[in-house]
Amino acid sequence: TIALSEEPPQLDSTRSTDASSFIVLAHTMEGLISYDNNDQLIPGVAARWEIRDDGATFWIREEAKWSDGEPVTAHDFEFAWTRVLDPTTAAEYAFILYPIKNAEAVNQGDLPKEMLGVRALSDTILEVDFERPTPYFDKLAAFNTYFPVREDFFESTNGRYGADADMLLYNGPY
């Protein structure tokens, strides 16, 4: 049970900005990396990761599943992050992805989304290129805006993704 002072306005992690939505999402979704009770980074959907000066690689746990039993894949992160940066999404927290190569230019509509420095090399390997060295990217990857979104489910909601509980697919620990 979670005690909230208000109903979350919507639970689309790519667009959420309020505390109520963040609290619910933190209990129902899991990103590549999570925080433990001592605010230390721990594996989330990623079994392991490597941060380099020029980018990062994340290896997805094969047992990571969505609430419908389908596997969580690197493609789900690529889709979500591309959606955050799509100018038509108008995500207020898009800037938090700007360490990713070409993210700001994609978000401003100056480059096509295909130029974004994130790609699923396979279902279990996500590769990220940086604009500049970002040694704290592991901390960013734990933020709600970096949560995965499965494209086929998103498309099936006809623009209502995250508007109601049945319009959201969960991958969190509960």
Give the ranges of each region predicted by the language model.
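Short, well-ordered beta-strand elements
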Residues: 1-9, 55-58, 77-80, 126-128, ...
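Gly/Pro-rich hinge or "lid" segments in bacterial periplasmic/extracellular proteins
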Residues: 129-174
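Aromatic- and charge-enriched surface segment that lines or borders ligand/interaction sites
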Residues: 48-96, 127
